[in-house]
């Protein structure tokens, strides 16, 4: 019987062997290679962190997404099916189709679609500051952050695009190779000198701290995401 690993949510389905763990336990799961499918319950940041751990473990499994975040960019890009439809198909012995999703390294970090220290970083910082009360869940905090920052973005974006210390990578815009400090395609190693040994960087909606002044961004691998039940 195939083994399925569910991260961050307890799941049960007749005919399937599903083991549940928390995201923080992934690096220490015994016999991780025995799991053919990994269900990621969460948003884009959760996906990024799980893929980073799997990359370190050098384990490739088919990824099943159960998007519960605010944006769910990866899930929307691949139009992933409902989780219950997927589990039903697997329990019936069907072999669902998958699609490839590239991911990239930024020094020791991993990201799938977005990285930068421009308006994206400012937006995430402010949106997370608003994450309380009625704004805790949903997209309202992100919309408010855009409205609050719009005047700053309009004034500062042209200058940031011309700066060697600023950058923004958005992989889905692959038709644009490079425009100023904006990158839409990562096919080779990109080296960026931030001239600062302590930097906050936005990666797929997460804010991480990078303690190097030189950033090296490069293709790091691919994952297979289940796309049809």
Label for each model-derived stretch:
Residues 17, 107, 203-205:
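Short strand-turn-strand beta-turns centered on an Asx-Gly dipeptide
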Residues 40-41, 114, 203:
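Short glycine/serine/threonine-biased micro-segments
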């Amino acid at each position: 019987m195939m083994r399925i690993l569910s991260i961050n949510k307890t799941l049960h389905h007749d005919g399937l062997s599903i083991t549940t763990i928390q995201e923080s336990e992934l690096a220490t799961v015994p016999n991780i290679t025995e799991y053919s499918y990994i269900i990621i319950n969460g948003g884009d940041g959760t996906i990024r962190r799980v893929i980073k751990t799997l990359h370190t473990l050098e384990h490739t499994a088919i990824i099943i997404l159960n998007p519960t975040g605010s944006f769910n960019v990866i899930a929307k890009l691949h139009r992933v099916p409902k989780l219950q439809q997927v589990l039903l198909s697997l329990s019936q012995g069907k072999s669902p189709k998958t699609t490839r999703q590239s991911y990239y390294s930024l020094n020791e970090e991993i990201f799938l679609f977005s990285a930068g220290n421009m308006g994206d970083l400012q937006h995430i910082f402010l949106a997370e500051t608003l994450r309380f009360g009625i704004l805790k869940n949903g997209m309202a905090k992100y919309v408010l952050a855009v409205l609050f920052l719009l005047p700053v973005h309009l004034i500062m974006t042209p200058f940031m695009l011309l700066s060697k210390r600023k950058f923004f990578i958005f992989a889905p815009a692959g038709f644009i190779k490079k425009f100023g400090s904006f990158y839409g395609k990562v096919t080779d190693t990109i080296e960026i000198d931030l001239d600062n040994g302590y930097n906050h960087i936005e990666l797929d909606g997460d804010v991480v701290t990078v303690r190097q002044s030189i950033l090296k961004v490069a293709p790091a691998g691919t994952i297979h995401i289940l796309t049809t039940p």
